[in-house]
């Protein structure tokens, strides 16, 4: 970008590349000419003192002018940034406006649809309300009609009762008159003796029945008042009245009359009768059929004329009794009585409405009628009463009776009653019309109210819509005003872009905040790249400023060409010192074409990892590292009162002790004895993991030792078994407890039986190799071979079979002691066909491994090729592994997400026995004979391979038997990132893979407990392997213990006594390997994202480290109590300087407890050793001190006890920092027994400069024997924090190392070995 003033890019004739502006160069030229004139006129001495001052002034002027140019460049960049931000803001604003318009249109359409649906709902609701109103009105009309019908029935019954009472009174009056008139007559005197007069017939006047009738006997015959010869003189009606049918005669419309009849009752063949209800309003005629045809012939018909209008009773009622031809003995008097009865019936209107003509039932109880209990008579039917009175009485009454006067009164009453009824009917009609009118008006009122409500709702909606339209109108006006303002602003195009006010302060603040967030995310990504590759920072190369500083001197040096040798070079100015995170813009020789190239240095370093690393960038990075370590060196060399000895920074307490105690303290310090790159030949090798070889074990269950083809037995084992028998026979519980405690202590000692051999897993881009070294002579690589193409993430040394191992076939539910029987007798086959598929959350997996039995007997030669040892399936799997894995820690973190992509994985949801045909046993692979010399000539390794097993030149039988029992002997287990598990022998034929299997996910950790190997997978499951019946490891049948869902990686495991602690996310699960169950789980950190990364156990405590955390946590091994927190970040910052150097953020990448010390390795290569304090120690060795507390812990699930040792507290006040460190993360610590320098060799107490330095001499009077341990740390690169990068390469401890360029040597994988002398306590 061309500026107004212009930047001159020019080259000096000497090629120095210095740049000077035109003004400064012009000034320099004029001063140069003036100086020439002065020298020509006077002498050089005149300007000799003036020259440095003028040069300094010109340099300052040039630097100021350069700064001015830089500021102008920055200003232009900021203007471009501002322009881009404004353009992006306008685009985003337009897009947002478009989206808001779309949203408004969609909202309007939705609102319209919603309104239509609401209108339909309201119309349906109004229709529903109208229908409900109509139904309600109809129901009201029905109820009113029912009430009216009930009222009419009540009025009818009342009139009927009144009419009956009037008739009764009238008949009584007639009887009294007749009896009074006929009381003196002779006829009555002669006939009075022949009958018994009754004042009144019994209620329900019942006819006497002939003897031949099958009907029931009435109540009147029970009284015995009527003799059989006088049966009321009513033999003319030979049938009872109940068998008489009243039929309508002389009716012009017989059909209509019959339709009006209501057949009220029937008489069955037995003579029973169902009666008419009392609520019947009409006076219906009852038709009573007869039982037999004979009775029908003898039946009398009474035909009653019934007019349509039942209220008119003034018509003639003719009753005609038809008699059939039969023998009757009836006199003329009786015929007269019959005609009188007919006349009375004719003048009695109630016979037209008689309901009780068929009132016989199976009993004498009346079924209907009004019964007057005071007179014990029937007050309803006059006909029944007269029928029972006899014809003589009626004849007596008829004589001299005047019926006309009373008949008129009755007719008048009936006529008046009829008129009243008509009036009432007319009123009822008017009333019903009015009620119907009221109903219609009510219905119309409800409909109008509904319409009014709908109109009100419509009015409210219209008002709301009106308000919305007004609001939209206001918004439209505001937008139009904004548009006018914007058009007015657009006219002011001469205003610069930075001064245009197009957005508010809030919007600008939001944009700036988003930019800052993006910057923070960019810096986080940059930090991640620094962690995974190396800590990067783009800093200016001081060489450019050196050249710029010397360019003016070059320009003016021509003045002193004759006296340049004698002129003293002035010191550089103070203001041009090196600035670490510089932000200067230095114009370079090459012309840069992009805007990014002119960004300041702190911006351009954010993008430097995207470009390829050139030699210049590597050089600048090394220069930056060198400057960083130079500042660390300056900080370390400050006098802070700490003691430096053997490469360690010790606390001040070592000064305060006496000479004897000081030597005793100094002798326990770790002394560095070896330091060198891991492999001189392969410089790209990266360290992953390492472990010391445990060569113990290889015993049968009764203590016998397995060597070659024969089995030898120890006498100690026999004594031990006899002692166990005696112990089991003993009844003393104290003896059992004592023996258990002794066994626990013996197992603790057995765990420390290691050899000095170390297996180190390294990887290149193509494959993973195993290097086997002896810690006593680390420079001599005993053997190296390739394992697989994937990264080996973990390695474990598994001892051989011991007599204390758990039996392989022991049931899971057993919790007793281990049976000391023979190996084969106590083990049962654990094949997939015989075990349960799921044991309480444990999945049993069975793999058919072809060639297992055949591989044990097939002889094979030594020195097998690593490629030949792998089956074809394994090679196919390993070839697909990603090779670009940054570092060990990040790669193991990445396995949680992407390790599940390996093929042929087993479905986790499938329960039951798995049958995996993935790998065959590599023992079955035949090895060519011509490869055997490779094995024999491999770095003099036979001396180490011959510790237990055989040499290549022994007999074939011995070799075969050794191969059979090789898995019974100590082995090495390697877990790869692709899920492959490899088992190699650790005693002989190291290259040969004895067993292998492909598991479901990446293998992150392997531990061994008493004949059980637990393998932690990245999917949150534990694979548990046991030995087979022959003592060899059976990888074809194993158990899977799921730690729960969701599945996450099991990052780390450690053995704590007889249990295994597993780090699973932020939790720690305690697993019992024998029972294969989870005993306890607790949180090691409150946040779920913080994963447990390392576990280290000693005594009764377990130290825990958390990912991306600098705090160590101590937990009790038995009670799981949180005991202590130790933060190492303040200590590291104090020892190595401020946080600008990248040392403030401390990640713990390696953790180990050894030699009564806690060894901590960090992500930036710092190694810290913290002595474990003895203040809280309960008992060192139980029972060796009188009066000391012996702590014993019991298991709540069994009667097992565990001896308490001590709790490994530590304090950062006693922490010791090692000046020997790595340039990148510390990958591992390994502690093995061994001694490089003798304890008698003494040194001057200064720091170590060669292999001959060592700890102070042991006192002759000290009686505690000292053990020597070698502690190995591995990591990328080496740095001495006291020396920085200047002499770090020259101080590598090793005598025969060839000198190589520091560019590659200082950044290779290095091993650092310390020797530690410590006592038994």
Curated annotation (Swiss-Prot):
Coiled-coil features, chain-numbered ranges: 66-166, 408-534, 724-758
InterPro entries: JIP3/JIP4, JIP_LZII, RH1, RH2, WD40/YVTN_repeat-like_dom_sf, WD40_repeat_dom_sf
Name of the gene: SPAG9
Keyword Coiled coil attributed: yes
Phosphothreonine sites (modified residues): 217, 292, 348, 365, 418, 586, 595, 1264
GO BP terms: lysosome localization; negative regulation of dendrite extension; negative regulation of neuron differentiation; positive regulation of cell migration; positive regulation of MAPK cascade; positive regulation of neuron differentiation; retrograde transport, endosome to Golgi; striated muscle cell differentiation
Residues with the N-acetylmethionine modification: 1
RH2 domain residues: 500-571
Modifications made to the protein after synthesis: Phosphorylated by MAPK8 and MAPK14.
Biased composition regions of type Polar residues, renumbered to the chain: 236-253, 266-285, 855-864
Primary localisation category: cytoplasm
Tissue specificity: Expressed only in testis on the round spermatids of stage I, II and II. Absent in spermatogonia and spermatocyte.
Entry GO CC: acrosomal vesicle; centriolar satellite; cytoplasm; cytosol; extracellular exosome; lysosomal membrane; perinuclear region of cytoplasm
Family classification: Belongs to the JIP scaffold family.
Molecular function as annotated in GO: identical protein binding; JUN kinase binding; kinesin binding; MAP-kinase scaffold activity; signaling receptor complex adaptor activity
Residue segments, region Disordered: 203-292, 473-500, 563-600, 854-906, 1239-1266
Protein's UniProt name: C-Jun-amino-terminal kinase-interacting protein 4
Record's subunit section: Homodimer. The homodimer interacts with ARF6, forming a heterotetramer. Homooligomer. Interacts with MAX, MAPK14, MAP3K3, MYC, KNS2 and MAP2K4. Interaction with KNS2 is important in the formation of ternary complex with MAPK8. Interacts with NFKB1. Interacts with PIP4P1. Interacts with PIKFYVE.
Lineage: Eukaryota, Metazoa, Chordata, Craniata, Vertebrata
């Amino acid at each position: 970008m061309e500026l107004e003033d212009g930047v001159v890019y020019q080259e000096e004739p000497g090629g120095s590349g210095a740049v000077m502006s035109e003004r400064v160069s012009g000034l320099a030229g004029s001063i140069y000419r003036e100086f020439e004139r002065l020298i020509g006129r006077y002498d050089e001495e005149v300007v000799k003192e003036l020259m440095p001052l003028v040069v300094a002034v010109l340099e300052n002027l040039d630097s100021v002018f350069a700064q001015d140019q830089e500021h102008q460049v920055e200003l232009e960049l900021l203007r471009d940034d501002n322009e881009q931000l404004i353009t992006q803001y306008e685009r985003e604003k337009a897009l947002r406006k478009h989206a808001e318009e779309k949203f408004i249109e969609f909202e309007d359409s939705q609102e319209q649809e919603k309104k239509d649906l609401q209108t339909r709902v309201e119309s349906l609701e109004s229709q529903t309300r109208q229908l409900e109103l109509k139904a309600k009105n109809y129901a009201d009309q029905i109820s009113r009609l029912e009430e009216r019908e009930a009222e009419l029935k009540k009025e009818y019954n009342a009139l009927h009762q009144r009419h009956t009472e009037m008739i009764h009174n009238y008949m009584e009056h007639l009887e009294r008159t007749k009896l009074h008139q006929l009381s003196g007559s002779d006829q009555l005197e002669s006939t009075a003796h022949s009958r018994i007069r009754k004042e009144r017939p019994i209620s329900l006047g019942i006819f006497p029945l002939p003897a031949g009738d099958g009907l029931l006997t009435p109540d009147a015959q029970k009284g015995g008042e009527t003799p059989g010869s006088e049966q009321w003189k009513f033999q003319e009606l030979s049938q009872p009245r109940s068998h008489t049918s009243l039929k309508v005669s002389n009716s012009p419309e017989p059909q209509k009359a019959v339709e009006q009849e209501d057949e009220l009752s029937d008489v069955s063949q037995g003579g029973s009768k169902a009666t008419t209800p009392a609520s019947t309003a009409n006076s219906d005629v009852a038709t009573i059929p007869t039982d037999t045809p004979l009775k029908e012939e003898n039946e009398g018909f009474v035909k009653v004329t019934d007019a349509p209008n039942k209220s008119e009773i003034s018509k003639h009622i003719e009753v005609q009794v038809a008699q059939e031809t039969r023998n009757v003995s009836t006199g003329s008097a009786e015929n007269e009585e019959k005609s009188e009865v007919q006349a009375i019936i004719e003048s009695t209107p109630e016979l037209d409405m008689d309901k009780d003509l068929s009132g016989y039932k199976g009993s004498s109880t009346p079924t209907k009628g009004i019964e007057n209990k005071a007179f014990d008579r029937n007050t309803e039917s006059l006909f029944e009463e007269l029928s029972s009175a006899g014809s003589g009485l009626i004849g007596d009454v008829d004589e001299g009776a005047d019926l006309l006067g009373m008949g008129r009164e009755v007719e008048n009453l009936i006529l008046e009653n009829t008129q009243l009824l008509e009036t009432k009917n007319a009123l009822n009609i008017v009333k019903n019309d009015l009620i119907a009118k009221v109903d219609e008006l009510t219905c119309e009122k409800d409909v109008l109210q509904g319409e009014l409500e709908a109109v009100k709702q419509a009015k409210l909606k219209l008002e709301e819509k009106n308000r919305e339209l007004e609001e939209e109108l206001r918004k439209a006006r505001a937008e139009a005003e904004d548009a006018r303002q914007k058009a007015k602003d657009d006219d002011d195009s001469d205003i610069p872009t930075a001064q245009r006010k197009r957005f508010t302060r809030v919007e600008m603040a939001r944009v700036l905040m988003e930019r800052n967030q993006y910057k923070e995310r960019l810096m986080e990504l940059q930090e991640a790249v620094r962690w995974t590759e190396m800590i990067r920072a783009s800093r200016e190369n001081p060489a450019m400023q050196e050249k710029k500083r010397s360019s003016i001197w070059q320009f003016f040096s021509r003045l002193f060409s004759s006296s340049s040798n004698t002129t003293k070079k002035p010191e550089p100015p103070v203001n041009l010192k090196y600035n670490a995170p510089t932000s200067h813009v230095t114009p370079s020789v090459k012309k840069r074409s992009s805007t990014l190239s002119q960004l300041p240095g702190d911006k351009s370093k954010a993008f430097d990892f995207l470009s390829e690393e050139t030699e210049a960038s590597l050089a600048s990075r090394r220069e930056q590292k060198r400057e960083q370590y130079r500042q660390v060196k300056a900080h370390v060399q400050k006098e802070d009162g700490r003691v430096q000895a053997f490469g360690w920074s010790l606390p001040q307490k070592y000064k305060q002790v006496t000479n004897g105690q000081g030597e005793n303290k100094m002798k326990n310090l770790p002394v560095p004895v070896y330091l060198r790159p891991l492999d001189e030949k392969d410089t790209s090798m990266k360290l992953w993991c390492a472990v010391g070889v445990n060569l113990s074990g290889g015993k049968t269950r009764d203590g016998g030792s397995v060597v070659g083809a024969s089995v030898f037995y120890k006498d100690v084992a026999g004594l031990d078994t006899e002692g166990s028998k005696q112990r089991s026979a003993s009844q003393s519980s104290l003896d059992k407890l004592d023996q258990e405690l002794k066994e626990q202590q013996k197992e603790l000692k057995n765990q420390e039986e290691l050899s000095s051999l170390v297996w180190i897993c390294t990887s290149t881009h193509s494959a993973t190799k195993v290097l086997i070294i002896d810690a006593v002579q680390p420079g001599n690589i005993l053997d190296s071979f390739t394992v697989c193409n994937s990264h080996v993430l973990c390695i474990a040394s598994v001892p051989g079979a011991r007599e204390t191992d758990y039996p392989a076939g022991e049931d899971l539910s057993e919790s007793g002691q281990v049976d000391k029987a023979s190996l084969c007798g106590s083990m049962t086959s654990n094949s997939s066909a015989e075990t349960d598929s799921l044991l309480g959350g444990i999945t049993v997996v069975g793999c058919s491994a072809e060639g297992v039995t055949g591989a044990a007997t097939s002889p094979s030669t030594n020195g097998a090729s690593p490629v030949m040892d792998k089956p074809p399936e394994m090679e196919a799997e390993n070839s697909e592994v990603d090779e670009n894995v940054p570092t060990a820690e990040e790669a193991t973190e990445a396995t949680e997400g992407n390790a599940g992509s390996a093929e042929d994985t087993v479905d986790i949801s499938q329960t039951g026995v798995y049958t995996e045909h993935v790998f065959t046993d590599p023992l079955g692979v035949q090895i060519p004979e011509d490869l055997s010399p490779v094995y024999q000539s491999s770095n003099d390794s036979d001396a180490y391979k011959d510790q237990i097993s055989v040499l290549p030149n022994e007999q074939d039988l011995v070799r075969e038997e050794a191969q059979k029992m090789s898995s019974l002997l100590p082995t090495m287990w390697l877990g790869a990132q692709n899920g492959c598990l490899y088992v190699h022998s650790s005693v002989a034929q190291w290259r040969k893979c004895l067993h292998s299997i492909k598991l479901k996910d990446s293998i992150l950790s392997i531990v061994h407990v008493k004949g059980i190997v637990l393998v932690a997978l990245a999917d949150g499951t534990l694979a548990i392997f046991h030995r087979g019946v022959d003592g060899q490891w059976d990888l074809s049948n194993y158990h899977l213990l799921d730690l729960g869902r969701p599945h996450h990686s099991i990052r780390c495991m450690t053995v704590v006594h007889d249990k295994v602690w597993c780090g699973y996310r932020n939790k720690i699960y305690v697993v019992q390997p024998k029972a294969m169950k989870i005993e306890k789980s607790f949180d090691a950190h409150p946040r779920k994202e913080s994963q447990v990364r390392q576990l280290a156990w000693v005594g009764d405590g377990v130290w825990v480290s958390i990912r991306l955390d600098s705090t160590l946590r101590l937990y009790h091994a038995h009670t799981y109590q949180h005991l202590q927190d130790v933060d190492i970040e303040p200590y590291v910052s104090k020892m190595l300087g401020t946080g600008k150097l990248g040392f403030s953020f401390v990640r713990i990448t390696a953790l180990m407890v050894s030699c009564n010390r806690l060894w901590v390795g960090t992500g930036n290569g710092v190694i810290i050793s913290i002595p474990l304090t003895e203040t809280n120690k309960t008992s060192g060795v139980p029972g060796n001190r009188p009066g000391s507390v012996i702590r014993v812990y019991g298991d709540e699930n069994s009667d097992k006890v565990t001896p308490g040792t001590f709790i490994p507290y530590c304090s950062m006040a006693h922490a010791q920092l090692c000046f020997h460190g790595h340039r990148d993360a510390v990958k591992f610590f390994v502690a093995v027994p061994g001694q490089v320098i003798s304890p008698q060799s003494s040194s001057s107490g200064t720091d170590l400069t060669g292999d001959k330095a060592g700890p102070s001499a042991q006192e002759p009077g000290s009686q505690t024997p000292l053990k020597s341990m070698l502690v190995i740390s591995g990591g990328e690169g080496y740095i001495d924090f006291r020396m920085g990068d200047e002499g770090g390469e020259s101080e590598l401890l090793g005598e025969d190392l060839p000198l190589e360029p520091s560019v590659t040597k200082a950044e290779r994988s290095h091993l650092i070995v310390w020797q530690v002398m410590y006592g038994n306590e």
